[in-house]
Amino acid sequence: RKPLNYLTKLVSDLAMERFRAGSAMVRYSDEEVGSTDRALGTYLAGAAAREFGPDAGQRAVIRLASSVPGNGLFAFGSRVLDLVVDGGAQDGTAKGASGGALAVLKGVNLDGLRVDGSTGKSFAYGAIGGRFLVQNCADSRACIRMSGADAVFGGRITGPVRDEEGNLASRAHLKGFAFEYMTGGRVVVLGDPGPWICAGMTGGVVYQCLYPEHGFTAESVRRRLARFAAVELLPLSGPGRADLDELLGAYVATLRASNQPAEAAAVQALLDQAPERFLMLVPRGLPPHQE
């Protein structure tokens, strides 16, 4: 059996060979990457930083089709990485990342339907930079200790949330404890953020989409706050609208590039209604856009 670090080392070796030869950009495509291929992108981020420094301009564009890579995808990723997965991801994705771009999108199954597009536990744990897009769901503790990165969770609410049934996490897009101890960064949540959110959050901003037509209102968001979470819900501000234009604009462009025009149009429609649809979760007493 191949070692668990085989593919990440292979990608790193191939890219570094091209970088040393003078190429500023390399492209790598693969398919059916599975759970035994761990920490994909991590080796390359480290090798590039050691040899060219953290501010080097090299870029590796990695595209993985029909894939669900193993734990630690993009972990400690840097600005050298631009990675898109059609399929899904597992635990520890984008953990400790300092830059770069990652998109986890739905893949096409044997019936031609788009499925999955989700990621595992502790997504973007402690990330200080980078832009991360997830089309569907994330397991528990998404964006905890995040301190400067940007994230978009694109799963949308399309039916009644049924809070009266309890067990909120089972139907939520984020499965609990999201944004715990978050100190900076920007997050957009198009779906249900799940229970026990924002515990110990002291910085950054979360933009939450509302769906009053499905019973998901500001009160629904308050119901999901962790006990003693010191955050407040504010109307969307001017700078907040600019953030949404930037982050959701990038997400819409990524959906269109992956041949998902219908989903891109649905997200664009939410963005067009941003003042009515979105509110901001910010630490109590702190400006939402502090430097």
Feature map (PLM): residue ranges:
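Long, distal/terminal scaffolding or interaction modules
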Residues: R1-E291
